[in-house]
């Protein structure tokens, strides 16, 4: 499996607090069957100012420790970018931490506020698409607007967005409503990727296998392979070549 959304880079957001916890999280992921991890710290303007240079520096330190500890895992980095017009300034400077390229499109992990979908979000998405950037919308099943009005996701499907649900939503960690919406969206074919959104060993570990088993049982092995390996691989493969 490939995990393309997690907060393992130590000390730069609300994820792993230090190097020791980061290494513990990586080991947990490996034990769970993960072979590649894309580290995606929050880029949340005014809260977590994780510019590309900050992320690169943190990644280099973690990668060195992983090699020193002889841990066998492929690592790369991007960011979970909070929806904000300020992202366009970084995009113009080519300083927005993105996923890789696939079929002529660059992909970006984009986070909506948990409480709502802001007015004008569709215009921002349209602008990104004109720049050949496809947003991968993080955890739509946990957004209050979508929980209350699930069909609102369709406007972003029409715009060409991809969607990533959280593994622990599938297994019920966030409650029955989030679980039901995640499974409904998967059944309807709206979801391309499942990822851990790991933050800590205790609160939200980087575990995918239980969610994969549930998806396999409900929707078949082919669907599970797409969500947990094929699609994550396709949009991040080039990251592991740099």
Where are these regions (language model features)?
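An N-terminally biased module of ancient metal coordination in phosphate/nucleic-acid-related enzymes
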Residues: 1-71
């Amino acid at each position: 499996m490939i995990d393309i959304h997690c907060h393992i880079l130590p000390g730069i957001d609300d994820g792993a607090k230090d190097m020791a916890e980061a290494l513990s999280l990586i080991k947990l992921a490996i034990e769970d069957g993960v072979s590649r991890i894309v580290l995606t710290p929050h880029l949340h303007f005014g809260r977590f100012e994780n510019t590309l240079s900050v992320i690169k520096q943190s990644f280099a330190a973690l990668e060195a420790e992983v090699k020193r500890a002889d841990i066998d895992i492929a690592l790369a980095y991007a960011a979970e970018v909070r929806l904000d017009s300020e992202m366009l300034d970084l995009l113009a400077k080519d300083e927005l931490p993105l996923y890789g390229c696939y079929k002529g499109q660059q992909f970006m992990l984009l986070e909506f506020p948990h409480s709502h979908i802001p007015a004008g979000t569709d215009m921002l998405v349209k602008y990104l698409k004109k720049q050949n950037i496809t947003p991968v919308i993080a955890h739509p099943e946990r957004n209050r607007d979508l929980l209350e009005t699930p069909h609102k996701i369709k406007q972003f499907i029409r715009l060409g967005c991809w969607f990533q649900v959280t593994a622990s939503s599938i297994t019920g960690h966030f409650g029955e409503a989030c679980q039901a919406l995640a499974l409904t969206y998967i059944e309807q074919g709206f979801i391309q990727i499942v990822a851990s959104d790991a933050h800590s060993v205790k609160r939200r570990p980087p575990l995918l296998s239980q969610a994969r088993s549930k998806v396999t049982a409900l929707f078949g092995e082919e669907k599970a392979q797409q969500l947990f390996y094929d699609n994550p691989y396709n949009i991040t493969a080039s990251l592991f070549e740099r």
